[in-house]
């Protein structure tokens, strides 16, 4: 048998081993790959929606919005039949979907306001504060005046709740922010402030506001009318604001037009170069109250 001598391969000999520089590069590459995988998992991993104390989005929200829009444009106001209700719905939803419901801005609803164009005739605008039901009864019977909820955007959203969540492209049907949660920039509040501002800016001629005279402060500075609408009336288009201070027909009657609260409203209006007028228990509206209380002394006609 031939004699063969086997020698040990020197560890210092270059072979298949990686250089130290290559080892470092490979290690860095692996770390980056692991980091990328972690990021992808975090992004794609389903997260639980934020939990709030308030009631959730109204069930069948999209169906209600679309249905109301069609009723309004095809039946109630056929002159607006050219409005695209499906586009209005999708634009509305984009204002709050996939967003933190406490970080909604006026700009989020700007495309919706721009999309829906509606002209309210001069002298036909009626604002209200703490008198919603009575104001709506009046415009429904009177037929020619408009509250905010008699406009298309106000009509489709009236009495609904909605919010989204940054973790999903759907609406939050579990909970939405409650007014007590220090979340003033929520989807509902911002929406009404935005369209209230537009409603006031578009008003012209003589405008009316229906106030609740049964309250200690018929004019409330923190209400939508007191904080948004009255300050967005354009004095170049509106020359007079008439306040109708309505009292509960079964309550104590008082001269609310001379109260400090109404005088504050008068001061605001006058400083903005508009005329102010006030009337307690505006008679046409009083008649509506009398329908349910026909025997009340204030409802009896002197024949």
Swiss-Prot record:
CDD domains, A to Z: Rib_hydrolase
Spans through the membrane: 22-44
Disulfides per UniProt: 69-85, 102-183, 163-176, 257-278, 290-299
Activity regulation (record text): Both NAADP and cADPR synthesis are inhibited by nicotinic acid.
Membrane topology: Single-pass type II membrane protein
Superkingdom per UniProt: Eukaryota
GO CC terms of this entry: basolateral plasma membrane; cell surface; membrane; nuclear membrane; plasma membrane
Annotated GO MF terms: hydrolase activity, acting on glycosyl bonds; identical protein binding; NAD+ nucleosidase activity, cyclic ADP-ribose generating; phosphorus-oxygen lyase activity; transferase activity
Primary role: Synthesizes the second messengers cyclic ADP-ribose and nicotinate-adenine dinucleotide phosphate, the former a second messenger for glucose-induced insulin secretion, the latter a Ca(2+) mobilizer. Also has cADPR hydrolase activity. Regulates osteoclastic bone resorption, probably via production of cyclic ADP-ribose and triggering of a cytosolic calcium ion signal through ryanodine receptor activation.
Quaternary structure (record): Homodimer.
Name this polypeptide is given: ADP-ribosyl cyclase/cyclic ADP-ribose hydrolase 1
Gene label: Cd38
């Amino acid at each position: 048998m031939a004699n063969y001598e086997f020698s040990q391969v020197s560890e210092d000999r270059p072979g298949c081993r990686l250089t130290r520089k290559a080892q470092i590069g490979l290690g860095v590459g692996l770390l980056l790959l692991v980091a990328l995988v972690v990021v992808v998992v975090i992004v794609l991993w389903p997260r639980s929606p934020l939990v709030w104390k308030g009631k959730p989005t109204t069930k069948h929200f999209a169906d209600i919005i679309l249905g109301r829009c069609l009723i309004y444009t095809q039946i109630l106001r056929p002159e607006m039949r050219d409005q695209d209700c499906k586009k209005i719905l999708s634009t509305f939803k984009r204002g709050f979907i996939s967003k933190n419901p406490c970080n909604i801005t006026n700009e989020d609803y700007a495309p919706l306001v721009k999309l829906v164009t509606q002209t309210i005739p001069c002298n036909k605008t009626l604002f209200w504060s703490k008198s919603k039901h009575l104001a709506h009864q009046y415009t429904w019977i009177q037929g020619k005046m408009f509250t905010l909820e008699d406009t298309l955007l106000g009509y489709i959203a009236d009495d609904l709740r909605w919010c989204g969540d940054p973790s999903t492209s759907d609406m939050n049907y579990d909970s939405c922010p409650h007014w007590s949660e220090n979340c003033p920039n929520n989807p509902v509040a911002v929406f009404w402030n935005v369209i209230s501002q537009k409603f006031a800016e578009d008003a012209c001629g003589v405008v009316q506001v229906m106030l609740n005279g049964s309250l200690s402060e018929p004019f409330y500075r923190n209400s939508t009318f007191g904080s948004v609408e009255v300050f967005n009336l354009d004095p170049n288009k509106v020359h007079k604001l008439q306040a109708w201070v309505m009292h509960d027909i079964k309550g104590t009657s008082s001269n609310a037009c001379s109260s400090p609260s109404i005088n504050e409203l008068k001061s605001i209006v006058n400083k903005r170069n508009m005329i102010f007028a006030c009337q307690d228990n505006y008679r046409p509206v009083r008649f509506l109250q009398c329908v349910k209380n026909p025997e009340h002394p204030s409802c009896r006609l002197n024949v």
